[in-house]
Amino acid sequence: MQTIDKFNFAGKKAFVRVDFNVPLDENFNITDDTRMRAALPTLKKILADGGSIIIGSHLGRPKGVADKFSLKHIIKHLSELLGVEVQFANDCMGEEAAVKAAALQPGEVLLLENLRFYAEEEGKPRGLAEDATDEEKAAAKKAVKESQKEFTKKLASYADCYVNDAFGTAHRAHASTALIAKYFDTDNKMFGYLMEKEVKAVDKVLNDIQRPFTAIMGGSKVSSKIEIIENLLNKVDNLIIAGGMTYTFTKAMGGKIGISICEDDKLDLALDLIKKAKEKGVNLVLAVDAKIADAFSNDANTQFCAVDEIPDGWEGLDIGPKTEEIFANVIKESKTILWNGPTGVFEFENFTHGSRTVGEAIVEATKNGAFSLVGGGDSVACVNKFGLASGVSYVSTGGGALLEAIEGKVLPGIAAINE
């Protein structure tokens, strides 16, 4: 398999798929440029070799052309980060993109407009009537799949080689993340540095396990984490359940949870997971106490109580001090750690203490030789907020992609390079 380190980009044009899906404020200023910075090593290596770059990315989830999702808003900052004046094409498919790509000289960079302005990027039909028949839907899908081939071929035609550095979209079989790779032979397609690091980190957590292995799963819904939890039960020694999922498990075991978030239709599922953990010899660690509030608000009245004795009208919004200690002790004794999802309602300052404690325990374990992988939107926000990111082994940029990889799924963006 080709690697970016071995490849010489001198005199070559590289199509680089990045994930510049960055948050913008109402004045189109970038509020967090982490994803842009993450791609810099790859982009700078190509330029240092004497290559030129055509950058493809998406921004948001537009259903067509929309100014607020235009990548033109990030050109100035990207130019500053790269130290090169980045050119911009107002399209991906039209004459402007083709002409500018053809004219690129070594050391130059061209940013294409948002790939998702085109239905062909995702390969899903747009603009169907709500009452469209199954036949109409099928015809529209067939049509977009056909035009997707032309779209992909056109993108590939701009470049001599292809670099995928967008782990955040690796779980999507989109035109620019997977299908395009077919137009380049094995020697001319490769992962960027970020993608390489992500793939190695996931591989280490799943296949090169130093024990004890502890996974901390937060988040509000058991239903969205079920496949991950089931896959992890075959791998981990300890599985810590945190966040809103706690109360579904607590209620399933007969506890009183007040008005805490709960998936009533998943109580049997929670019991089944408890049973499976027992059968596999996995230590399933659940909260014993909670920080509860009389309203879903940062300013609500709060108290601590046993997690299964929450009074009516109150809801659990974070773990309590006894649980913090239990979780921290398990984490500190671990040698491989995966953290996905905070322990409480992280958006409210008064309910971040549990997440901070977990983060600090992970940093301590890492100092003592553990490998720690933090991934999935909110847990990444946690370690960044508390200044702990530098103390863990790896912070993943991919939310959904990371979770699907941990579920054991083959990611199309990775498979396309390996083929």
Curated annotation (Swiss-Prot):
SUPFAM superfamilies: Phosphoglycerate kinase. It comes from the Bacteria. ATP binds at K225, G316, E347, G376, G377, D378, S379. InterPro entries: Phosphoglycerate_kinase (IPR001576), Phosphoglycerate_kinase_N (IPR015824), Phosphoglycerate_kinase_sf (IPR036043). Gene3D superfamilies: Phosphoglycerate kinase, N-terminal domain. The keyword ATP-binding applies. Its EC number is 2.7.2.3. Belongs to the phosphoglycerate kinase family. This is Phosphoglycerate kinase. It comes from Bacteroides thetaiotaomicron (strain ATCC 29148 / DSM 2079 / JCM 5827 / CCUG 10774 / NCTC 10582 / VPI-5482 / E50).
